[in-house]
Amino acid sequence: MKTKRLTVAQATIEYLKNQYVERDGVQNKFFAGCLGILGHGNVAGIGQALHQNLDFPFYVARNEQGMVHTAAAFARVKNRLQTFVCTSSIGPGATNMITGAAAATINRIPVLLIPGDIFATRQVAPVLQQ
């Protein structure tokens, strides 16, 4: 077996691509792709890994709350056998996903939210939302 070096983000995308659910003996890919708004906090990690994995579709969203509602609606249509990963930038982008997450939780709809983050040791200039 050959070792394959991956970043954490690349390994995460590989892991998500290989998740399956089984019902009545039929296996389905669990994640149909990723919906997201790339910004500070997720471009360098998840954004780059998604760009390198063209077989895991990425769809640009325009609103974080709508993105989560879209993923939940897709999961409902697919009878909870398939859903989307949702990613956003840090700060308000991440908090805008909370309403959609609450609605999905109440309705027992699977969605995976991956908000952006920054390195704890990173020394950056004082920029809004960091």
Spans of model-derived segments:
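N-terminal alpha/beta PP-like core and its mobile active-site loop of ThDP/TPP-dependent enzymes
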Residues: 2-130
